[in-house]
């Protein structure tokens, strides 16, 4: 009798032992269709190297936990209803069909059509937002928070349940969140650690017509990413300002542009009245000379004229917070009965910002920056007063300084503003400039990429290893001199070397640190150096103060008192040290109160 087992018999036993393992592995691979997209690659890598029953059991437990997270998110999504009065609701099925059949869809509609609040709900209805988030970008923090609150309210939930938001210094996203509102800057920062955007199954780029630097970079990045993420859907929403440009940008390999769907619905006629800020004055010699009049007086006179037209709220556009405060004071001096004056700009507190959306009696006059032009829909507006001005960021290649001058807006922006009065009924818009002046204005506002310093976007591109900058698919390529200026600044900051790799410079260790900090490269360089010198806490306060508007209030009627109150924080040698004194005072006061 032979005690030795034959090789054939041994091999057969090994194969039999491996059969259950192969079966379990196959089942686990199939189960990956139900786990978050961001986890799939990690699970595949673990499964590839797992050969024992114990290893597969551990992976199986983790896969089941991941599937439970997806199921939890799905179970939390309520039944979805759509306001039938919104134009976008009438095109619901058309939009859902296009999203199902195409990787990119462009949706064009005027402010108030409902596209910003209803499209995320349609995507939830389609089953998206389960294995990955529906990322929804906004150009402004106020809009991101307000839109998230509105969608959550329509779903009957609190913020942070199925709908959350992430803006600088405030993150309200939980493990049940399916729709994530955020500024486009937040999404750009996330690319540093999630280059394939695996946290998302859908990206909505809202207000794309604004053509900010971040939006243009995101559109180029997504064009490169889509072939590598065939499961990712991209929705580009825009006002009816050249939506075909976005469709052409996302043309497929055969050159077919992405589909465009119009959802503006009905708009009402708007009567445009021109009231230039000049007053004819008869001179001693009998001639008539036009004298410039005060803008605030012009706004007050326009409001008086519109109040004689009938009921309805008035929306007035200004270029700055200071002008808004001055106008509030001027209107309050009129002592109009039953008139509420409400400001609207980005630096207001949450409670003050919500006032503009709260129900009210009587007439309301809303004094706003251009945030109400497209980002937010102010309800009840029948009349508009347009000063024709806005702060527009511009970079001087000669002085190497980024400025924020007050300029005349474009024809497209003026039409956007006047259109706010024709959403629910016939409207009237008063422009505080002449028709000749309007006709002489540029048709569109220059995209930000043509009027800003490009150091930050160039740094992002180098960090993400996107190759030759001149080959990047920008919707509109930047000026070569602006790119050179950006590279020169990064070189001066010590962020890049003289060497090149793949047609692009190479980051230094300092450059890699700067790229991870979501502020202007010059300020990020300050933080890196402060950390090296051991003064990071103080310099962080100074940098933070440089990235926002002055926190000190100087109301027109209390300027002397304000200056007296602020005097204790003044440092004769440096405004930066004044900011630090103010911060220390706030910290000490908080400690005392607590």
Task: Specify the residue positions occupied by each region the protein language model found.
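C-terminal helicase lobe and adjacent C-terminal extensions/tails of nucleic-acid helicase motors
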Residues: 304, 329, 456, 491-497, ...
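P-loop NTPase motor module signature
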Residues: 1-526, 533
